């Protein structure tokens, strides 16, 4: 599992940590490992920072999420990132309830991989799960859907699984053409991925419908 936290809430060397800030945790005197691939680009960070107080917080944060998706996350393989960072805590500066790109990273992994990436703090050697701004995940999902071909899906995770299946199918085609051998294992895995995509899509639609009903009751 990957968790996220801030330097004030996680002061321990008991667990593997990675700074994902642009200055590698310098402001917190952090001496541990870093994962610069997830750091925000200075160009859009400056625009966002300079706009604080000049435009609405909602508009400004949406700009940040949009650029972070365009310039950082869309270039990365979520499965590779998860493998490399598994069993670690990703660190940045802001308190858990404040807008921060670590919350965008958590939302991205949860949306595409169907995993849980909790925000945590360390208290008397106990890991305590805390809250984070939920609107960040909603904004990211909206932006991702607006920037890719959903191919009839409503769930980004379902689309991700379907396209992974297509990649395996294409790989089998290429290898069979090159070697003359059968790669039924790849084709079977591709079939499983497409079936999983259909199940994820169905569950996503049900949850959306239930969410709408719950809001109407309120």
Where in the sequence are the language-model features?
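Residues lining hydrophobic/aromatic ligand-binding pockets adjacent to catalytic sites
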Residues: 1-135
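Charged, low-complexity interaction regions
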Residues: 148-153, 173-186, 209
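The feature captures the hydrophobic core positions of alpha-helical coiled-coils
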Residues: 168, 172-175, 190-193
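A compositionally biased, intrinsically disordered/low-complexity signal enriched
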Residues: 164, 174-175, 200
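Short, charge-rich amphipathic interface segments used for partner binding and complex assembly
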Residues: 182-206
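Short amphipathic alpha-helical heptad-repeat segments
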Residues: 154-169
């Amino acid at each position: 599992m990957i968790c996220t936290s801030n330097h004030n809430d996680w002061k321990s060397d008991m667990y593997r940590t990675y700074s994902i800030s642009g200055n590698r945790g310098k402001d917190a005197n952090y001496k541990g490992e870093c994962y610069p691939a997830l750091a925000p680009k200075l160009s859009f960070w400056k625009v966002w920072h300079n706009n604080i107080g000049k435009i609405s917080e909602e508009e400004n944060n949406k700009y940040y999420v949009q650029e972070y998706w365009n310039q950082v996350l869309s270039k990365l393989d979520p499965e590779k990132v998860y493998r490399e960072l598994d069993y670690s805590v990703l660190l940045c500066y802001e308190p858990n309830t404040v807008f921060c790109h670590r919350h965008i990273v958590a939302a991205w992994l949860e949306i595409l991989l169907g995993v849980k990436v909790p925000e945590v703090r360390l208290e008397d050697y106990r890991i305590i799960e805390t809250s984070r701004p939920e609107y960040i995940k909603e904004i990211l999902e909206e932006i991702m859907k607006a920037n890719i071909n959903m191919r009839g899906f409503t769930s980004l995770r379902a689309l991700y699984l379907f396209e992974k299946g297509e990649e395996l199918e294409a790989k089998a085609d290429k290898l069979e053409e090159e070697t003359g051998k059968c790669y039924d294992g790849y084709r079977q895995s591709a079939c499983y991925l497409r079936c999983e995509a259909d199940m994820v899509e169905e569950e996503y639609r049900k949850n959306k419908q239930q969410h709408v009903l719950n809001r109407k009751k309120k």
